[in-house]
Amino acid sequence: MDLDVVNMFVIAGGTLALPILAFVASFLLWPSALIRIYYWYWRRTLGMQVRYVRHEDYQFCYSFRGRPGHKPSILMLHGFSAHKDMWLSMVKFLPKNLHLVCVDMPGHEGTTRSSLDDLSIDGQVKRIHQFVECLKLNKKPFHLVGTSMGGHVAGVYAAHYPSDVCSLSLVCPAGLQYSTDNKFVQRLKELQESAAVEKIPLIPTTPKEMSEMLQLCSYVRFKVPQQILQGLVDVRIPHNTFYRKLFLEIVSEKSRYSLHQNMDKIKVPTQIIWGKQDQVLDVSGADMLAKSIANSQVELLENCGHSVVMERPRKTAKLLVDFLASVHSTDNSKKLD
Protein backbone atom coordinates (compact mmCIF):
# COMPACT_ATOMS: atom_id res chain seq x y z
CA MET A 1 0.00 0.00 0.00
CA ASP A 2 1.11 3.63 0.57
CA LEU A 3 2.08 3.61 4.24
CA ASP A 4 5.77 4.24 3.69
CA VAL A 5 5.00 7.71 2.31
CA VAL A 6 3.86 8.97 5.69
CA ASN A 7 7.42 9.47 6.90
CA MET A 8 8.38 11.48 3.84
CA PHE A 9 8.46 14.86 5.59
CA VAL A 10 11.57 14.03 7.58
CA ILE A 11 13.21 12.57 4.50
CA ALA A 12 12.20 15.32 2.10
CA GLY A 13 12.84 18.18 4.49
CA GLY A 14 16.03 16.81 6.02
CA THR A 15 17.89 14.92 3.34
CA LEU A 16 16.59 15.79 -0.13
CA ALA A 17 18.49 19.08 0.02
CA LEU A 18 15.70 20.91 -1.81
CA PRO A 19 15.20 24.59 -1.02
CA ILE A 20 12.67 24.98 1.76
CA LEU A 21 10.35 27.16 -0.30
CA ALA A 22 10.28 24.65 -3.15
CA PHE A 23 9.50 21.89 -0.70
CA VAL A 24 6.65 23.84 0.89
CA ALA A 25 5.22 24.78 -2.52
CA SER A 26 5.34 21.17 -3.67
CA PHE A 27 3.73 20.01 -0.44
CA LEU A 28 0.86 22.48 -0.70
CA LEU A 29 0.30 22.59 -4.46
CA TRP A 30 1.58 19.34 -5.95
CA PRO A 31 1.62 16.63 -3.27
CA SER A 32 1.44 13.86 -5.89
CA ALA A 33 4.63 15.20 -7.52
CA LEU A 34 6.33 15.18 -4.13
CA ILE A 35 5.38 11.52 -3.68
CA ARG A 36 6.98 10.65 -7.04
CA ILE A 37 10.14 12.51 -6.02
CA TYR A 38 10.14 10.57 -2.78
CA TYR A 39 10.22 7.21 -4.59
CA TRP A 40 12.81 8.42 -7.09
CA TYR A 41 15.00 9.59 -4.23
CA TRP A 42 14.78 6.30 -2.34
CA ARG A 43 15.48 4.18 -5.41
CA ARG A 44 18.57 6.28 -6.09
CA THR A 45 19.71 6.19 -2.46
CA LEU A 46 19.30 2.41 -2.21
CA GLY A 47 20.95 1.70 -5.55
CA MET A 48 17.81 0.33 -7.20
CA GLN A 49 17.89 0.82 -10.98
CA VAL A 50 14.76 0.83 -13.15
CA ARG A 51 14.72 -1.15 -16.39
CA TYR A 52 12.22 -2.37 -18.99
CA VAL A 53 12.06 -5.69 -20.80
CA ARG A 54 9.68 -6.89 -23.50
CA HIS A 55 7.97 -10.19 -24.20
CA GLU A 56 6.62 -9.85 -27.74
CA ASP A 57 4.45 -6.69 -27.53
CA TYR A 58 4.19 -6.73 -23.73
CA GLN A 59 6.43 -4.52 -21.59
CA PHE A 60 7.51 -5.25 -18.02
CA CYS A 61 8.95 -2.56 -15.75
CA TYR A 62 11.18 -3.59 -12.87
CA SER A 63 13.85 -2.34 -10.51
CA PHE A 64 16.91 -4.28 -9.48
CA ARG A 65 20.06 -4.18 -7.41
CA GLY A 66 23.09 -6.43 -7.66
CA ARG A 67 23.87 -9.28 -10.01
CA PRO A 68 23.16 -13.03 -9.93
CA GLY A 69 25.75 -14.84 -7.82
CA HIS A 70 26.14 -17.96 -5.72
CA LYS A 71 23.19 -16.92 -3.56
CA PRO A 72 19.68 -17.21 -5.06
CA SER A 73 18.27 -14.15 -6.79
CA ILE A 74 15.17 -12.73 -5.08
CA LEU A 75 12.06 -11.81 -7.08
CA MET A 76 9.46 -9.70 -5.25
CA LEU A 77 5.78 -9.45 -6.21
CA HIS A 78 3.80 -6.54 -4.76
CA GLY A 79 0.15 -6.45 -3.75
CA PHE A 80 -3.04 -5.09 -5.28
CA SER A 81 -2.82 -1.47 -6.56
CA ALA A 82 0.77 -1.09 -5.30
CA HIS A 83 3.98 -1.04 -7.36
CA LYS A 84 7.60 -2.15 -7.28
CA ASP A 85 8.61 0.72 -4.99
CA MET A 86 6.56 -0.63 -2.08
CA TRP A 87 9.53 -2.92 -1.32
CA LEU A 88 11.97 -0.03 -0.82
CA SER A 89 11.35 0.23 2.92
CA MET A 90 12.48 -3.41 3.26
CA VAL A 91 15.25 -3.21 0.63
CA LYS A 92 16.90 -0.65 2.90
CA PHE A 93 17.63 -3.45 5.39
CA LEU A 94 18.68 -6.17 2.94
CA PRO A 95 22.39 -6.94 2.30
CA LYS A 96 23.76 -5.29 -0.82
CA ASN A 97 25.32 -8.54 -2.02
CA LEU A 98 21.88 -10.00 -2.78
CA HIS A 99 20.47 -9.83 -6.30
CA LEU A 100 17.05 -8.19 -5.91
CA VAL A 101 14.38 -7.83 -8.59
CA CYS A 102 11.09 -5.98 -7.94
CA VAL A 103 8.63 -6.09 -10.83
CA ASP A 104 5.49 -4.06 -11.48
CA MET A 105 2.67 -6.60 -11.61
CA PRO A 106 0.51 -6.82 -14.78
CA GLY A 107 -1.22 -3.50 -15.46
CA HIS A 108 0.55 -1.69 -12.63
CA GLU A 109 2.83 1.35 -12.92
CA GLY A 110 5.28 0.80 -15.82
CA THR A 111 4.12 -2.67 -16.87
CA THR A 112 1.74 -2.89 -19.84
CA ARG A 113 -1.96 -2.40 -19.16
CA SER A 114 -4.11 -4.02 -21.83
CA SER A 115 -7.86 -4.52 -22.02
CA LEU A 116 -7.09 -7.92 -23.54
CA ASP A 117 -4.89 -9.07 -20.67
CA ASP A 118 -5.95 -12.02 -18.52
CA LEU A 119 -5.95 -10.56 -15.00
CA SER A 120 -6.96 -13.79 -13.27
CA ILE A 121 -4.42 -15.27 -10.86
CA ASP A 122 -3.47 -17.91 -13.44
CA GLY A 123 -3.12 -15.18 -16.06
CA GLN A 124 -0.83 -13.17 -13.80
CA VAL A 125 1.24 -16.27 -13.02
CA LYS A 126 1.80 -16.80 -16.75
CA ARG A 127 2.84 -13.16 -17.19
CA ILE A 128 5.33 -13.36 -14.33
CA HIS A 129 6.75 -16.53 -15.89
CA GLN A 130 7.24 -14.62 -19.14
CA PHE A 131 9.08 -11.93 -17.19
CA VAL A 132 11.27 -14.53 -15.48
CA GLU A 133 12.19 -16.07 -18.83
CA CYS A 134 12.92 -12.66 -20.37
CA LEU A 135 15.49 -11.98 -17.63
CA LYS A 136 16.65 -15.62 -17.61
CA LEU A 137 16.07 -15.39 -13.88
CA ASN A 138 15.35 -19.12 -13.79
CA LYS A 139 18.78 -20.02 -15.17
CA LYS A 140 19.12 -21.31 -11.64
CA PRO A 141 16.29 -21.50 -9.08
CA PHE A 142 15.44 -18.20 -7.38
CA HIS A 143 13.73 -17.18 -4.15
CA LEU A 144 10.21 -15.83 -4.69
CA VAL A 145 8.55 -13.33 -2.34
CA GLY A 146 4.97 -12.11 -2.57
CA THR A 147 2.63 -10.10 -0.37
CA SER A 148 -1.19 -10.06 -0.41
CA MET A 149 -2.24 -10.44 -4.09
CA GLY A 150 1.44 -10.85 -4.93
CA GLY A 151 1.62 -13.65 -2.35
CA HIS A 152 -1.36 -15.29 -4.03
CA VAL A 153 0.45 -15.16 -7.37
CA ALA A 154 3.76 -16.27 -5.83
CA GLY A 155 2.24 -19.35 -4.19
CA VAL A 156 0.50 -20.47 -7.38
CA TYR A 157 3.69 -19.75 -9.36
CA ALA A 158 5.69 -22.05 -7.05
CA ALA A 159 3.07 -24.76 -7.59
CA HIS A 160 2.98 -24.36 -11.39
CA TYR A 161 6.71 -23.84 -12.01
CA PRO A 162 8.47 -25.83 -9.25
CA SER A 163 11.80 -26.03 -11.08
CA ASP A 164 12.05 -22.21 -11.20
CA VAL A 165 11.85 -21.67 -7.45
CA CYS A 166 14.27 -22.79 -4.74
CA SER A 167 12.33 -21.27 -1.83
CA LEU A 168 9.31 -19.11 -1.14
CA SER A 169 8.21 -16.33 1.22
CA LEU A 170 4.47 -15.67 1.48
CA VAL A 171 3.60 -12.47 3.33
CA CYS A 172 -0.10 -12.43 4.36
CA PRO A 173 -1.10 -13.91 0.98
CA ALA A 174 -4.60 -13.76 -0.46
CA GLY A 175 -6.24 -16.78 -2.08
CA LEU A 176 -7.21 -18.91 0.92
CA GLN A 177 -10.66 -20.24 1.77
CA TYR A 178 -11.62 -19.60 5.40
CA SER A 179 -14.36 -21.39 7.33
CA THR A 180 -15.73 -18.01 8.46
CA ASP A 181 -15.37 -14.56 6.90
CA ASN A 182 -13.85 -11.64 8.79
CA LYS A 183 -15.58 -8.23 8.83
CA PHE A 184 -13.66 -6.98 5.79
CA VAL A 185 -14.60 -9.97 3.62
CA GLN A 186 -18.21 -9.78 4.80
CA ARG A 187 -18.31 -6.15 3.70
CA LEU A 188 -16.82 -7.02 0.31
CA LYS A 189 -19.45 -9.70 -0.26
CA GLU A 190 -22.20 -7.22 0.61
CA LEU A 191 -20.75 -4.75 -1.90
CA GLN A 192 -20.58 -7.47 -4.57
CA GLU A 193 -24.19 -8.46 -3.97
CA SER A 194 -25.34 -4.85 -4.22
CA ALA A 195 -23.06 -4.21 -7.24
CA ALA A 196 -21.56 -1.23 -5.39
CA VAL A 197 -18.14 -1.52 -7.02
CA GLU A 198 -17.53 2.20 -6.49
CA LYS A 199 -17.25 1.61 -2.73
CA ILE A 200 -14.48 -1.00 -2.57
CA PRO A 201 -12.43 -0.05 0.55
CA LEU A 202 -9.11 -0.79 -1.17
CA ILE A 203 -9.87 1.70 -3.96
CA PRO A 204 -10.15 5.11 -2.26
CA THR A 205 -11.41 8.14 -4.17
CA THR A 206 -11.19 10.81 -1.45
CA PRO A 207 -8.66 11.73 1.26
CA LYS A 208 -11.14 10.42 3.88
CA GLU A 209 -11.38 7.06 2.13
CA MET A 210 -7.59 6.97 1.79
CA SER A 211 -7.25 7.53 5.55
CA GLU A 212 -9.75 4.73 6.19
CA MET A 213 -7.81 2.39 3.90
CA LEU A 214 -4.56 3.13 5.72
CA GLN A 215 -6.28 2.37 9.03
CA LEU A 216 -7.68 -0.86 7.60
CA CYS A 217 -4.30 -2.05 6.37
CA SER A 218 -2.14 -0.90 9.27
CA TYR A 219 -2.10 -1.64 12.99
CA VAL A 220 -0.10 1.53 13.63
CA ARG A 221 -2.30 4.63 13.49
CA PHE A 222 -0.42 7.20 11.44
CA LYS A 223 -1.45 10.85 11.47
CA VAL A 224 -1.15 11.68 7.79
CA PRO A 225 -1.51 15.34 6.72
CA GLN A 226 -4.46 16.14 4.48
CA GLN A 227 -2.18 17.26 1.64
CA ILE A 228 -0.40 13.91 1.54
CA LEU A 229 -3.69 12.02 1.66
CA GLN A 230 -4.80 14.15 -1.29
CA GLY A 231 -1.55 13.40 -3.09
CA LEU A 232 -1.97 9.66 -2.57
CA VAL A 233 -5.51 9.86 -3.96
CA ASP A 234 -4.41 11.99 -6.93
CA VAL A 235 -1.78 9.41 -7.86
CA ARG A 236 -4.31 6.57 -7.76
CA ILE A 237 -7.47 8.07 -9.26
CA PRO A 238 -6.37 7.77 -12.94
CA HIS A 239 -5.93 4.03 -12.34
CA ASN A 240 -9.09 3.29 -10.34
CA THR A 241 -11.06 1.94 -13.30
CA PHE A 242 -8.32 -0.62 -13.86
CA TYR A 243 -8.12 -1.41 -10.13
CA ARG A 244 -11.85 -2.13 -10.04
CA LYS A 245 -11.58 -4.44 -13.04
CA LEU A 246 -8.61 -6.22 -11.49
CA PHE A 247 -10.26 -6.52 -8.09
CA LEU A 248 -13.42 -8.07 -9.53
CA GLU A 249 -11.25 -10.53 -11.46
CA ILE A 250 -9.15 -11.70 -8.51
CA VAL A 251 -12.19 -12.17 -6.25
CA SER A 252 -14.13 -14.01 -8.98
CA GLU A 253 -14.92 -17.70 -8.64
CA LYS A 254 -12.09 -18.52 -11.05
CA SER A 255 -9.38 -16.85 -8.96
CA ARG A 256 -10.57 -16.29 -5.39
CA TYR A 257 -9.18 -19.53 -3.93
CA SER A 258 -6.38 -20.34 -6.38
CA LEU A 259 -3.72 -20.51 -3.66
CA HIS A 260 -5.91 -22.75 -1.52
CA GLN A 261 -6.38 -25.10 -4.47
CA ASN A 262 -2.64 -25.23 -5.18
CA MET A 263 -0.99 -25.00 -1.75
CA ASP A 264 -0.49 -28.77 -1.40
CA LYS A 265 1.53 -28.68 -4.65
CA ILE A 266 4.14 -26.33 -3.15
CA LYS A 267 7.20 -28.46 -2.41
CA VAL A 268 9.95 -25.88 -1.83
CA PRO A 269 10.94 -24.57 1.62
CA THR A 270 8.34 -21.94 2.45
CA GLN A 271 8.32 -19.06 4.89
CA ILE A 272 4.93 -17.70 5.98
CA ILE A 273 4.88 -14.21 7.54
CA TRP A 274 1.70 -12.64 8.89
CA GLY A 275 0.72 -9.68 11.05
CA LYS A 276 -1.33 -10.83 14.03
CA GLN A 277 -3.63 -7.82 13.75
CA ASP A 278 -4.32 -8.20 10.01
CA GLN A 279 -7.86 -6.91 9.37
CA VAL A 280 -7.83 -7.69 5.63
CA LEU A 281 -6.76 -11.35 5.55
CA ASP A 282 -7.16 -13.31 8.76
CA VAL A 283 -3.96 -14.50 10.43
CA SER A 284 -5.39 -18.03 10.74
CA GLY A 285 -4.40 -18.42 7.08
CA ALA A 286 -0.82 -18.93 8.26
CA ASP A 287 -1.73 -22.15 10.08
CA MET A 288 -3.80 -23.27 7.10
CA LEU A 289 -0.77 -22.95 4.81
CA ALA A 290 1.61 -24.56 7.30
CA LYS A 291 -0.58 -27.66 7.51
CA SER A 292 -0.59 -28.05 3.72
CA ILE A 293 3.04 -27.18 2.91
CA ALA A 294 5.32 -29.83 4.41
CA ASN A 295 8.53 -27.82 4.51
CA SER A 296 7.26 -24.56 5.96
CA GLN A 297 7.76 -22.24 8.91
CA VAL A 298 5.49 -19.54 10.30
CA GLU A 299 6.43 -16.11 11.65
CA LEU A 300 3.63 -14.13 13.30
CA LEU A 301 4.34 -10.47 14.02
CA GLU A 302 2.86 -8.75 17.07
CA ASN A 303 1.32 -5.29 16.71
CA CYS A 304 1.30 -5.57 12.93
CA GLY A 305 -1.51 -5.39 10.40
CA HIS A 306 -1.82 -6.33 6.73
CA SER A 307 0.91 -4.01 5.44
CA VAL A 308 3.70 -6.08 6.97
CA VAL A 309 6.47 -4.79 4.69
CA MET A 310 5.58 -1.17 5.43
CA GLU A 311 4.94 -1.53 9.15
CA ARG A 312 7.82 -3.86 10.01
CA PRO A 313 10.42 -3.54 7.22
CA ARG A 314 13.49 -4.22 9.37
CA LYS A 315 11.94 -7.30 10.99
CA THR A 316 10.65 -8.64 7.67
CA ALA A 317 14.08 -8.18 6.06
CA LYS A 318 15.77 -10.01 8.95
CA LEU A 319 13.30 -12.89 8.77
CA LEU A 320 13.89 -13.18 5.03
CA VAL A 321 17.69 -13.12 5.34
CA ASP A 322 17.67 -15.64 8.21
CA PHE A 323 15.35 -17.94 6.27
CA LEU A 324 17.53 -17.81 3.16
CA ALA A 325 20.62 -18.50 5.24
CA SER A 326 19.04 -21.56 6.85
CA VAL A 327 17.79 -22.95 3.53
CA HIS A 328 21.08 -22.20 1.78
CA SER A 329 23.22 -23.82 4.51
CA THR A 330 20.96 -26.88 4.49
CA ASP A 331 21.35 -27.21 0.72
CA ASN A 332 25.14 -26.97 1.04
CA SER A 333 25.17 -29.65 3.72
CA LYS A 334 23.18 -31.99 1.49
CA LYS A 335 25.68 -31.47 -1.34
CA LEU A 336 28.52 -32.51 0.98
CA ASP A 337 26.78 -35.68 2.20
From Swiss-Prot:
Gene3D superfamilies: alpha/beta hydrolase. It is a single-pass type II membrane protein. The chain crosses the membrane at residues 20-42. It catalyses: Hydrolyzes glycerol monoesters of long-chain fatty acids; 1-octanoylglycerol + H2O = octanoate + glycerol + H(+); 1-decanoylglycerol + H2O = decanoate + glycerol + H(+); 1-dodecanoylglycerol + H2O = dodecanoate + glycerol + H(+). Its EC number is 3.1.1.23. Residues 72-313 form the AB hydrolase-1 domain. Residues 1-19 are extracellular. One of its GO terms (cellular component) is lysosomal membrane. It comes from the Eukaryota. It is an enzyme of class 3 (hydrolase). One of its GO terms (biological process) is regulation of retrograde trans-synaptic signaling by endocanabinoid. It is found in: Late endosome membrane; Lysosome membrane; Mitochondrion membrane. The active site is at residues 148, 278, 306. One of its GO terms (molecular function) is phospholipase activity. Residues 43-337 are cytoplasmic. Keywords: Endosome, Hydrolase, Lipid metabolism, Lysosome, Membrane, Mitochondrion, Signal-anchor, Transmembrane, Transmembrane helix. Lipase that preferentially hydrolysis medium-chain saturated monoacylglycerols including 2-arachidonoylglycerol. Through 2-arachidonoylglycerol degradation may regulate endocannabinoid signaling pathways. Also has a lysophosphatidyl lipase activity with a preference for lysophosphatidylglycerol among other lysophospholipids. Also able to degrade bis(monoacylglycero)phosphate (BMP) and constitutes the major enzyme for BMP catabolism. Belongs to the AB hydrolase superfamily. This is Monoacylglycerol lipase ABHD6.
